[in-house]
Structure formats: structure tokens, C-alpha cells
Amino acid sequence: KPLYFLLFALSPLAAAENIYAPGQAALKFNQWYIAQLDQNKPPVLNPDIMNDYVASGTIAAIKEMYSGDSNDKDMPDADMFIKAQDWDDDWNQITVLHSDFDAVCTNVYVAFGKKQDHVIADCLVEEQGKWKVRSATLIK
């Protein structure tokens, strides 16, 4: 009986960990991503280094977009993950605001900077037991 009680008592902790996993994954990804940009190493130019953070289908799409002559393709005006052409010095201060989910993904709302005036929603999916970014949408 004590073992059943212990398992029952610890089950909320496991559930809580699963609830927060997408937010933690989005936070880690954005911290890493901004650090790469600060070092002038845009990850989209070397997408294989994003395997720990970005969904495999998204990495394949990035490779396709950046293959060949960019003059033959429509290229995005803004970075596809931070949804901006440039970033402020304080964007390494990243805050997860909240999350919600739908049939497609878990959306994690992330704010950049002290004022939190740049907000994106990262669409995360679970891939081989890990939460990974599929796409990002500019919120404000």
C-alpha cells in the first residue's frame, strides 16, 4: 500500500512536468537562437545544428528554401523564428508568457527584451519524445 500511495502522490509532479515541457523547450530554443545570432551565426544558414530544437520537417523546409539560387525564390523579409529583421541588445531576456494547444501544436507565447514588446508564438510539436519548434508567428 505505501508504494501505491507514493506513486499516486508523485503522479501530479509528472503531469506538471509534461505541462511545462513545451514552454521550457521554447525558452531553451530562443535563448540558444538569440545567442547564435549575437555571435553572428544565423542557424538558418546551417540548419543541421538546430536538430535538438526544431522539427525535422521544418529543417527540411529551411534546407530547401536556402538551397540553390535565392534570386529564383521568394525569401522571407524577417528571420523565420524571431519574426524580425534585427533584434535589440536586451532580447537575450526571454520570457514565456503562456501557452495553449490545438490539434496542430502547442503554441508557446514568448516575449523578448525587458519591456517584452516583441512577442511571438512558437508552434511546438512532440517529435521522438522531445518538444521541437515547427514554426513561429509574430504576435506583436
Predicted regions and their residues:
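Short, aromatic-enriched amphipathic alpha-helices that serve as compact interaction elements
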Residues: 20-38
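Hydrophobic h-region of N-terminal signal peptides that target proteins for export
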Residues: 7-16
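Short beta-strand edge/turn micro-motifs at domain boundaries
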Residues: 117-140
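Sec-dependent signal peptide recognition
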Residues: 1-7
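Surface-exposed, charged secondary-structure patches
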Residues: 17, 54-114
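Short, solvent-exposed secondary-structure junction/capping segments
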Residues: 34-38, 42-67
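Soluble non-cytosolic domains of exported or imported proteins
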Residues: 19-24, 44, 114-118
